[in-house]
């Protein structure tokens, strides 16, 4: 059931403990060890992948956080999900072309651009809305090159007739927070360096309408979208961002935001543990780090640097009440923009990505597109 107003419903299921940033992929199964030719072979989360784990101390696991990451004593990092990639293509797929462009040579970071194929036939001056997208994955997994994000943005670009730029950023644990926020702001600056039509990337120069720029992201990317909109306001970014879409944002804190928020201490501590041990181990505030505890950090939202915000929440998502509390705080902040809240009562975290054939996925896509085109 779809609701556009906040309401009470049952507490998110404790079974979400291992799915709080991203639902477990359908292919995921707990790692198991089998003996082959006298060696241990550990089956990873992707069933088609096998990796030999030799019996010596360097292969000792010192930290494991399914379904995200495994850390070995010798310093190796093994991601347990979100590692599959698909290539960009200049051959139209679903009437959309794509390509990868490096925006940060120092960190070897790229953006993936998506453009309606028909736009390449348009005369100069026919500009398109510009969508800047930040992927989810708990600041640990996924990338703009993941199939779920490539496919999602292909559909968005086709439906909205826009230019999309999907941003790669450094991920934990190799690069803890705030690296992701530094990179995404650098990407925004790089994109806006094209606003006069003289940047280094031709598609942005030719097709991006900088009077119609939108930020968007899901999960960790939803959190990043908020912080980027806030920084855009603080830095007085010009032209001003038109809107921000915040989908199932990964926002947390040591304590519940209300009586309907997750009360189970095991779940609360489990979410906090991923943040404190993997994502931001240097934070002195733990789960109350202002990057993570957006609602309870005492930050002032009145300087949000865009004109409108769409907040999407899911009733079976562990971040459900945090998302609603975020929207409520934004409405009361004195910010002059418009806030719309959409609640899918019977859906889980990022259902539109993980189950695009679900009953509510088409309506989600319709609202997402209308926010950009409306």
UniProtKB/Swiss-Prot annotation:
EC number assigned by the record: 3.1.1.1
Enzyme type, top EC level: hydrolase
A GO cellular component entry from the record: mitochondrion
Positions of disulphide bridges: none
Tissue expression remark: Expressed in leaves, stems, flowers and siliques.
Motif Involved in the stabilization of the negatively charged intermediate by the formation of the oxyanion hole in this chain: 135-137
Pfam families xrefs: Abhydrolase_3
Compartment(s) of residence: Mitochondrion
Reaction(s) catalysed (UniProt annotation): a carboxylic ester + H2O = an alcohol + a carboxylate + H(+)
Lineage top rank: taxon: Eukaryota
GO molecular function: carboxylesterase activity
Gene3D superfamilies found in the cross-reference section: alpha/beta hydrolase (3.40.50.1820)
Location of the active site: 219, 317, 349
Keywords carried by this UniProt record: Hydrolase, Mitochondrion, Serine esterase, Transit peptide
Transit peptide: 1-52
Biological role: Carboxylesterase acting on esters with varying acyl chain length.
Family the UniProt entry places it in: Belongs to the 'GDXG' lipolytic enzyme family.
Protein name stated in the entry: Probable carboxylesterase 4, mitochondrial
Taxonomic source organism: Arabidopsis thaliana (Mouse-ear cress)
Lineage: Eukaryota, Viridiplantae, Streptophyta, Embryophyta, Tracheophyta
Annotated gene: CXE4
């Amino acid at each position: 059931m779809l609701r556009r107003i906040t309401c009470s419903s049952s507490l998110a299921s404790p079974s979400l403990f291992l799915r709080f940033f991203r639902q477990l992929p359908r292919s995921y199964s707990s790692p198991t060890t089998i003996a082959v030719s006298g060696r241990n072979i550990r089956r990873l989360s992707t069933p088609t992948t096998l990796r030999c784990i030799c019996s010596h101390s360097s292969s000792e696991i010192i930290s494991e956080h399914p379904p995200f990451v495994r850390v070995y004593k010798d310093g190796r990092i093994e991601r347990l999900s979100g590692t599959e990639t698909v290539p960009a293509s200049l051959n139209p797929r679903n009437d959309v072309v794509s390509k990868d462009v490096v925006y940060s040579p120092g960190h070897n970071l790229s953006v993936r651009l998506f453009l309606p194929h028909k736009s390449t036939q348009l005369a100069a001056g026919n500009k398109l809305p510009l969508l800047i997208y930040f992927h989810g994955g708990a600041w640990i997994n996924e990338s703009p090159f993941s199939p779920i994000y490539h496919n999602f943005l292909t559909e968005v670009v086709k439906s909205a007739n826009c230019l999309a730029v999907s941003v790669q950023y450094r991920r934990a644990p190799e690069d803890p927070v705030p690296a992701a926020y530094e990179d995404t702001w650098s990407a925004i600056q790089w994109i806006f360096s094209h606003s006069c039509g003289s940047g280094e990337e031709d598609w942005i120069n030719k097709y991006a309408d900088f009077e119609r720029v939108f930020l968007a992201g899901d999960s960790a990317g939803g959190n990043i979208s908020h912080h980027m909109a806030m920084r855009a306001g603080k830095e007085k970014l010009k032209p001003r961002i038109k809107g921000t879409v915040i989908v199932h944002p990964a926002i947390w804190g040591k304590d519940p935001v209300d009586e309907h928020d997750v009360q189970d201490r095991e779940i609360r501590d489990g979410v906090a543990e991923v943040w404190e041990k993997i994502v931001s181990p240097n934070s002195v505030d733990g789960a109350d780090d202002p990057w993570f505890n957006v609602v309870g950090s005492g930050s002032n939202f009145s300087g949000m640097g865009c004109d409108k915000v769409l907040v999407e929440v899911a009733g079976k998502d562990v971040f459900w009440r945090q998302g609603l509390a975020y929207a409520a705080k934004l409405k009361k902040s004195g910010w002059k923009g418009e806030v719309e809240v959409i609640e899918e009562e019977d859906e889980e975290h990022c259902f539109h990505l993980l189950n695009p054939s679900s009953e509510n996925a088409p309506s989600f896509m319709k609202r997402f597109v209308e926010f950009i085109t409306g």
